[in-house]
A protein has these predicted regions:
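Amphipathic, small/basic residue-rich leader segments at the start of a protein or domain
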Residues: 1-112, 131, 135
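Glycine-rich, histidine-containing beta strand-loop boundary motifs that form or position
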Residues: 81-85, 112-116, 150-151, 181
Length: 187
């Protein structure tokens, strides 16, 4: 599939991806499958039985999720397609996307943490200052920090055209955030 549909051998002709041909893609996908089968998939059923909760102001993930995410990050899976200069492995996004697909198939609820963190990294790479990139991306790639999704507001649901929350830059370079969110995915 990586050869025929993804054209991985053509991707390997792009500068900086020369070592990311079919053999590399196959090896990475095989290791990803082992990780997901051995670590992530077993948490699917147990996560449904002992789901996450909000207890006295503290978010508690399903048993095993924290340890599994630490293993995911330590194994380099969070940084697979992220730039080398921020601690990533610099592999083509197509290889990273295939690995994310395996994680999603193994346990969709667990995979959201990695997916949302990847989305936050992508937002920083696209629109963040060099200072923000240097501060946040290495911590997200390493698994020390994660990303969330904060869209839903009481008056808007998830209709982004109707959200009212604002981030106003302050003189000291920080942002003052005002508004109300009613759901924070992986918060």
């Amino acid at each position: 599939c990586m050869k025929e549909l993804a054209g991985i051998d053509q991707v390997a002709t792009i500068p900086d991806f020369e070592d990311a041909g079919y053999e590399t893609a196959q090896a990475v996908l095989e290791e990803s499958a082992k990780f997901n089968e051995g670590v992530v998939a077993p948490l699917n059923w147990s996560g449904d039985q002992d789901h996450g909760s909000w207890d006295n102001g503290v978010v508690r993930a399903s048993k095993g999720f924290k340890e599994a995410y630490a293993a995911l990050a330590e194994g380099g899976w969070q940084g697979l397609g992220q730039p080398l200069e921020y601690g990533g492995q610099g592999l083509p996004k197509i290889i990273g996307a295939a690995c994310v697909e395996q994680t999603m198939a193994a346990n969709l609820s667990f995979s959201l943490c990695s997916i949302l963190t990847g989305g936050a990294i992508e937002a920083l790479l696209t629109a963040g200052s060099d200072e923000l990139k240097t501060r946040y991306i290495p911590n997200m790639v390493s698994g020390k920090w994660t990303g969330t999704m904060n869209l839903t507001e009481p008056q808007a649901g998830s209709d982004l055209a109707l959200v009212r929350s604002k981030a106003v830059k302050q003189d000291d370079g920080t942002y003052r955030i005002s508004g109300q969110k009613i759901f924070i995915t992986y918060g």
